[in-house]
C-alpha cells in the first residue's frame, strides 16, 4: 500500500532503493520521498516518453503506475486530479518567471 510523503507503493519503493543504491531510504523521510519522486519522474520520462515538464501526463503516470498508465482515460477521477495538477504547475511556472525577472533586475547597489 502507499505510504509517506510520496505515497509510494512498496514494490516501486523497493525498486527505487535498489536502482539508486539508497538502501537506508524510508518513505517516512521527506528527503527520501522527494528524491524518489525525482527518480520516478525521470524514469517515467524514459519508459513512457513523457516529458518531465508535462505535469498532466506525469501525474497520470504517477497516479496510475507505469503498467496501468495506458488505461488512464477510463479513470475520470484521475483525469480531474491531473487537470488540477496541470493548472497548479502552470501557476507555479508563471510565478517562477516573474521571480526570475525580478531577480535579474539590478536594483541593489553594492558599494
Residue ranges of model-derived segments:
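Alpha-helical segment that forms one wall of the substrate-binding/catalytic cleft
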Residues: 3-57, 61-70
